UniProtKB/Swiss-Prot annotation:
Principal subcellular localisation of the protein: cytoplasm
Compartments where found: Cytoplasm
Listed EC numbers: 2.1.1.77
GO molecular function, one term: protein-L-isoaspartate (D-aspartate) O-methyltransferase activity
Matches recorded under SUPFAM superfamilies: S-adenosyl-L-methionine-dependent methyltransferases
One family name in Pfam for this protein: PCMT
Gene designation per UniProt: pcm
One record GO biological process: protein modification process
Residue positions of the active site: 66
Identification of the protein by name: Protein-L-isoaspartate O-methyltransferase
Keyword S-adenosyl-L-methionine among record annotations: yes
Keywords, sorted A to Z: Cytoplasm, Methyltransferase, S-adenosyl-L-methionine, Transferase
Record-level GO cellular component terms: cytoplasm
Functional description taken from the UniProt entry: Catalyzes the methyl esterification of L-isoaspartyl residues in peptides and proteins that result from spontaneous decomposition of normal L-aspartyl and L-asparaginyl residues. It plays a role in the repair and/or degradation of damaged proteins.
Amino acid sequence: MLHGIGMTSQRTRARMIERLREKGIRNEAVLKAMAAVPRHVFVEEALASRAYEDTALPLGMGQTISQPFVVARMIELLLNGRSSLGKTLEVGAGCGYQAAVLAQLTKDVYAVERLGPLLEKAKANMRILQQFNVRLKHADGQLGLPEAGPFDSIIVAAAGSHVPPALLEQLAPGGRLVLPVGAGEQYLSFIEHTPQGYVETRLDAVRFVPLLSGTQ
């Protein structure tokens, strides 16, 4: 199951990594992490043959598993120039795919998901992969996870109209935050916590599901 056959085989997975290289992902540690995680484990069985396409796929409950390029791009922004992501918070764990990639690059991942059924899927997937350095919590991601902060890296998998203040408060000095922002047109925001304050760089146009409050 982990190695896959046919459209989920190692060869198919290797082609996905080559596509990421062609699209501009240069960080070898990020590419290695993407190659290490079997994406087909995280998608519905009916979609397994599409698991290594560079596209977002539906998870149910109005949510998606993110496009591999976008996952790699966001993690590369967090990692570049560092040997590790350090203590990392993921907002919007979904089925756990991105958390599993993050877990290849640090020993300390905290991931929150507001939808209980998706969180249970993520927990089951972590058990399948024996990925024991991911702590999953049912929580409102806009509030972060203050009891576990501050964080060296924060990554958000849903777009709000603004940057949630709680996430800035939980970003450690020297920390990095990457998230989509925008209620209509969205862009990728990269924020660094410098001695002079928070410095934001606006990057690629993106499309994510909305960042919602509360839990279900």
